[in-house]
């Protein structure tokens, strides 16, 4: 079975030994993704804006892997503050209306207090 590792180029990946995404078999597994905007090197303080940026970041790596947003089959949402979850629902619906993946929401601390959420996905490769 072929395995392909996709890197964002972050030093953090090599420091702790992980990949931005891994393609294995017919699936791509995307690591937890935050709302950090890598073009501006900033992160919004608004959880809804961060959710939008999370999906932009996820979409970029899925395309690199040979997949797309509509192929997401599993999604995990991680929120430090559970009250930030519901305001993001319109963003989730916008991106996931076709995929309708299995979903779980966790409440847990994140690496940086500026991070209002993190999203991890599993998707099928394009047919």
Language-model segments: which ranges?
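N-terminal presequence-like segments and the immediate start of the first folded domain
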Residues: 1-56, 60-73, 79-127
């Amino acid at each position: 079975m072929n395995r392909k590792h996709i890197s964002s180029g972050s030093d953090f990946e090599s420091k702790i030994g992980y990949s931005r995404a891994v393609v294995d078999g017919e699936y791509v597994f995307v690591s937890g993704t935050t709302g950090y905007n890598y073009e501006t090197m900033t992160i919004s303080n608004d959880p809804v804006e961060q959710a939008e940026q999370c999906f932009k970041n996820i979409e970029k790596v899925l395309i690199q892997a040979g997949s797309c947003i509509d192929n997401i089959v599993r999604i995990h949402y991680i929120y430090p503050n559970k009250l930030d979850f519901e305001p993001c629902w319109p963003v989730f619906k916008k991106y996931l209306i076709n995929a309708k993946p299995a979903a779980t929401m966790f409440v847990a601390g994140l690496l940086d207090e500026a991070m209002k959420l993190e999203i991890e996905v599993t998707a099928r490769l394009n047919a």
